[in-house]
């Protein structure tokens, strides 16, 4: 596997709509950076979030998940994640991953250095949709996540050959997702 450079990412974004909307350069302007980087793409989080809250000391069960465990917040500026808590967001960008590509997502150092961990599971070949982002506030203090700014870097890896079965072939459960998507079994 090889990591795609800015040239390869740009070509796939323009010719195959791999990232839409696609920002062809790093944008800073007093914001947490987003857009094309040397070997990745810094995606932005949108303005809708779901923040965990404790309802009657419920237990989080991924097989029987209740949307009542979240409060939905919409903000064009930022949201606040309570201390030692968790939130979900979604990318502004829609991703259309080619068959011979997979994607690994890592959090931006700006957030990591303030105790905010961004997690996303690998994005498999031929996935299509927005990407749900998981945020953990590991600090004992409330923490801000800025809407419409960079939150995570997407690294695109080209396989040695196309897979026998892609995410689309398997009819992956998160295929075509838009907005913040809760767990599915």
From Swiss-Prot:
This is dCTP deaminase. Transmembrane segments: none annotated. PANTHER family: DCTP DEAMINASE. Belongs to the dCTP deaminase family. SUPFAM superfamilies: dUTPase-like. Keywords: Hydrolase, Nucleotide metabolism, Nucleotide-binding. The keyword Metal-binding does not apply. The gene is dcd. HAMAP family: dCTP_deaminase.
């Amino acid at each position: 596997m090889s990591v795609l450079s800015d040239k390869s990412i740009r070509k796939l974004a323009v010719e195959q709509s791999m990232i839409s909307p696609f920002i062809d350069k790093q944008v800073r302007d007093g914001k947490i950076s987003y857009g094309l980087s040397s070997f990745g793409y810094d995606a932005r989080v949108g303005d809708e979030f779901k923040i965990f809250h404790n309802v009657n000391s419920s237990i989080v069960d991924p097989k029987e998940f209740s949307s009542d465990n979240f409060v939905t917040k919409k903000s064009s500026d930022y949201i606040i994640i309570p201390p030692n808590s968790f939130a979900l967001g979604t990318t502004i960008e829609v991703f259309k991953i080619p068959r011979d590509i997979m994607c690994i997502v890592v959090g931006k150092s700006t957030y990591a250095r303030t105790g905010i961990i961004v997690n996303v599971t690998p994005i498999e070949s031929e996935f299509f949709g927005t990407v749900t982002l998981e945020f953990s506030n590991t600090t004992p203090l409330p923490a801000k996540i800025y809407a419409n700014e960079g939150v995570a870097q997407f690294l695109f890896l080209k396989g040695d050959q196309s897979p026998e079965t892609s995410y689309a072939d398997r009819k992956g459960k998160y295929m075509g997702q838009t907005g913040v998507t809760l767990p599915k079994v």
